[in-house]
UniProtKB/Swiss-Prot annotation:
<dbReference type="InterPro" id="IPR007612">
    <property type="entry name" value="LOR"/>
</dbReference>
<dbReference type="InterPro" id="IPR038595">
    <property type="entry name" value="LOR_sf"/>
</dbReference>
<comment type="similarity">
    <text>Belongs to the LOR family.</text>
</comment>
<dbReference type="Pfam" id="PF04525">
    <property type="entry name" value="LOR"/>
</dbReference>
<dbReference type="InterPro" id="IPR025659">
    <property type="entry name" value="Tubby-like_C"/>
</dbReference>
<protein>
    <recommendedName>
        <fullName>Protein LURP-one-related 8</fullName>
    </recommendedName>
</protein>
<comment type="function">
    <text>Might be related to the phospholipid scramblase and tubby-like superfamily of membrane tethered transcription factors.</text>
</comment>
């Protein structure tokens, strides 16, 4: 299948990872391509940083997170024959050795605020708490005493505080986490809680 890759002078990914301060991204749940489902992500300067373009007739169990120029950064795939909702994330477009796995929390006994657990090689890395339907989530680092490493918040106008709705929201990523990983987790949450 042919892919469309717009030409941009430079990618914003390097500047995002070099930052020591929190990175604020605006996530728009809309593809830039006609007849596609996906995401468009901008930095604080309004520059395109990430994009996801899924054609309407393609299955949603294989998603590719790309940079602004269309280079594949991470592949997100639903785990087949899994008891729960489980997603595996790979580097680029590879299908070997997942970087991490995200599993939806289905236990009614455990913490009700917990949405999902993220692990790598049987070690829990992150816990995601909050409500994706309300666009109010925190990604907590389990290795650093549940320190907040990223947050999803509703985006509001500067004047008047009017919310944009559920399709436009902020992703605030602390320096301890890669922005591409935080965006991959946001995409997984959208798949897990699509009807919310």
């Amino acid at each position: 299948m042919t892919k469309v890759h717009p030409k941009f002078p430079s990618t914003c990914e390097e500047s995002l990872c070099d930052s020591k301060a929190a990175v604020v991204l605006t996530v728009w749940k809309k593809s830039l391509l006609f007849n596609c489902d996906g995401f468009t992500v901008y930095n604080a300067n309004g520059e395109l940083v990430f994009r996801v373009d899924n054609y309407m007739n393609c299955p949603r169990d294989n998603i590719v997170l790309m940079d602004a120029s269309g280079f594949p950064l991470l592949s997100i795939r639903r785990k087949k024959l899994s008891l729960g909702d489980c997603w595996m994330v790979y580097d680029g477009e590879t299908e070997r050795d997942p970087i991490f796995t995200a599993r939806k929390n289905v236990s009614i006994i455990s913490n009700r605020k917990s949405l999902a657990w993220v692990s790598a090689k049987k070690t829990v890395l992150y816990e995601i708490e909050g409500s994706y339907g309300q666009r109010s989530c925190k990604i907590l680092d389990e290795r650093r005493n549940k320190k907040k490493t990223a947050e999803i918040k509703r985006k509001e106008t500067v004047i008047g505080g009017v919310a944009f709705g559920k399709d436009v929201y902020k992703l605030i990523v602390e320096s301890e986490m890669e922005p591409r990983v935080a965006m991959a987790l946001t995409i997984i949450l959208d798949q897990m809680f699509r009807s919310s």
